[in-house]
Amino acid sequence: MKKIISISASVVLMVTVSFADISEKQVDAYLEVSGAKIMFDNLQQQIGDMVDQQAQQSGEKVDPMALVAVKDVMTRDENFAKFTAHIKTLDENDYKNIMAYYATELGKKSAKIAENSDIETMEKELPIFMTKLQENPPSEKRMNLIKDIIDAMDMDELQKNMLREMFVSVNKFAPAKQQMSSDDIDKMVESFTPMLEQQVQISTLFSYKDFSDKELEEVLNYAKTKSGKAEVDVIFAGLVDYMKAVMSQMFQELLDQEKAK
């Protein structure tokens, strides 16, 4: 069980509106221009790499069937549909405004962040970035902009909600005598909150490292618009529902693998 929890924690820490549903074609167009498609296209390899790394750190060999099971769960169409279902709830006006933003140079630059979020890039560049950060700390203005962007995009809350879903899934499959109450789960999430917030801050600084302060102000201004907030809402809700389904199925698959040994 500890191994399963550790694997799932690695997965988590990695990665509302007027209801005139937009079409599948419009959803696909959004996924393409926003960078979300790249993020999900790379997800299978990222999860496989993280499971492999976690096993190596624990000194255990990865069961190939466990890797297959994890990748299968993460890439099931019905699970991805839980994410896109929320994007479909965007009203036409918000959708047009969001697409207009991603058509701008700043929007295109924002979308490219997903291209640099793969494990290989992060492992190679993040340590270098952290060293530079220590040698030349960001200005107070830049740090405040980063914090405001994190707040506007609900990044901290998203991480906490996704972590909570992991603990809920762990709890569901734990022996009856070891199961936690909802309050206990909330306390566990809160105990991880400082670490999560620090990781979100560092990853956001890294993601926007090539953005000027003026560009950060423009990103923040967009995030505060009605349409920007609508985008945040659907992404937040979609990712939480996606992870809720994935975590439950992943635990079941991994437990089935262990029982079959």
Residue ranges and their predicted role:
Residues 113-114, 118-126, 130-133, 137-138, ...:
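Outer-membrane beta-barrel domain signature
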Residues 29, 33-36, 68-73, 83-86, ...:
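Second-shell loop/turn segments in exported
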Residues 23-24, 33-44, 73-80, 88-95, ...:
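Solvent-exposed, acidic/flexible segments
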Residues 15-21:
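Sec/Tat signal peptide C-region and signal peptidase I cleavage site
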Residues 2-10:
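Sec-dependent signal peptide recognition
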Residues 21-121:
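N-terminal Sec/ER secretory leader and immediately downstream segment
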Residues 199-261:
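A cross-kingdom marker for long, charged
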Residues 119-209, 213:
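Extended amphipathic alpha-helical interaction segments
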